[in-house]
């Protein structure tokens, strides 16, 4: 089941979706029969979903640096930020280990990345509270 969808900021034929059981997939709408798994590592690594519950929201994350984007821009998917029912806010990237930004004891129902200052993220938590996260550049360049 799909809970959230986001369209790539510059390649409008690429979208990313968040759904059940921790799944995050990207689709090239020109080839819709071949989804690209984002939330687990590739076949040469152990499958490692960042969460096991519903993914409530996904957004392309232009703030996180990807080591592979420059070398193969046409083939790579931008990193994706996601939040889940089990309280995880993380950045997932194709064939990379997830980068967990926040782990709460309640669901993170929604979030938004400030377009003017993309290091700032605001989260809506299940307990009717708001979380504000400011990301440092050093933490975002993890290999």
PLM ranges: what are they?
Residues 24-28, 89-94, 130-135:
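WD40-repeat beta-propellers
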Residues 32-34, 96-97, 138-140:
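Short coil/turn linkers that define WD40 beta-propeller blade boundaries
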Residues 36-48, 97-102:
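A short beta-strand motif characteristic of beta-propeller blades
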Residues 18-21, 83-86, 124-127:
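Conserved strand-to-loop turn within each blade of WD40 beta-propeller repeats
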Residues 1-27, 31-34:
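Beta-propeller domains
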Residues 11-16, 65-81, 98-99, 118-122:
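Structural hallmark of WD40 beta-propellers
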Residues 109-143:
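Blade-level signature of beta-propeller repeat domains, shared across WD40, Kelch, NHL, RCC1
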